[in-house]
Each structure stands twice: as C-alpha cells, then as structure tokens.
Amino acid sequence: MPRVHVFARDHINTDEIIPARHLTTDIEAELAPYAMEDYDRDFAKRVQPGDIIVAGADFGCGSSREHAVWALRGAGVGAVIAPNFARIYYRNSINNGFLALECDGIVEAFQDGDEANLDLKGGTITNLRTGQTLTFVPVPQFALDVQKAGGWLEYMRAQVPAEADDSSSAQPHPGKENAHA
C-alpha cells in the first residue's frame, strides 16, 4: 500500500516543489532528488514508488512549470491529493498523465506515514490506520485516458492511427482526387 506524505500548508508553490536552481534539465530522474527540497530536504530519500502526497489548498501555485509535475513523478509520487490546486498545476498534471485529486478534508484525515488505499474508479481514499474513507472529485475519463497513455503527447500519438483508420473510408479531400493522376 502506498504511504502518505503530508504537506499540510496551503499555497505550496512550484518553487518549493522543484526549486528554480534545479531547472537545468527536463529529465525526471535528474529532477527527482530535488523534489520538495526547500520544504523537506529528506523527502526524495523517503518517498517510494506509488506514494501519495497529501497537501493543503492551492497546491502548485506560483510559476507555471511542468518541472513541478516531472520532479514529483520522477521521485515516485503516484498522486497528489489536496482540497484544490492552482489551475495551471492541475492542467500540467493532466497533460503529463499525473494524478492531481481534489478532496475536501484530506489534510485532517491523514498523518505523515499513514498507508492509504486509493480507489480511482470508486473515487475514494481510505486511511488504513483509522479506517476513514473520503470521497474525491471524480477524475474525468479523459484525464484517466491521458494518464494511462503517459501524458497528452502520448495520448495524441495513440489517437493518430485510430483517426487514420477512420478516415481511410472517407471521401477524398476536395482538390485531392486527381493529385496522383
């Protein structure tokens, strides 16, 4: 089961998620050691693949940088759950196939190190220590599809062959009928 890392403060900004001094690469594995460094210097050493960050409101505010998502994903974080997110961070999460889940009362329901059961289909997270279950805002199917594909670009690349197959029986584009005549 994934462990929970609680960052209870509201307005944790992208500079705290990945400090600007480390924005010299876009390789997740190279960003990972610096994830949350200015907030918790040892976070990247403790986090395990699939672990969950529980955070306060407006997580990801500040500068628009995809590196904030890449650093957390590179460190092994499986999802961030907060009451709400800065819109640009939320969109960057979707575009990069990373789970950002909105859930009221999440910070009060968990302590650092708790284990959790995250049920995406059911829209719930359960604290295994206390048995408390909370419901989060359902993830739109589109966002789940993008996440499953690994990000927006990968999702779109997968759509191109499907669209090409659909268009093979379509009428030729006007003016293209005699292109090879």
Swiss-Prot record:
It holds the Pfam family Aconitase_C. It catalyses: (2R,3S)-3-isopropylmalate = (2S)-2-isopropylmalate. Gene3D superfamilies: Aconitase, domain 4 (3.20.19.10). CDD domains: IPMI_Swivel. Its EC number is 4.2.1.33. Pathway: Amino-acid biosynthesis; L-leucine biosynthesis; L-leucine from 3-methyl-2-oxobutanoate: step 2/4. It is an enzyme of class 4 (lyase). Heterodimer of LeuC and LeuD. Belongs to the LeuD family. LeuD type 2 subfamily. Catalyzes the isomerization between 2-isopropylmalate and 3-isopropylmalate, via the formation of 2-isopropylmaleate. This is 3-isopropylmalate dehydratase small subunit. The gene is leuD.
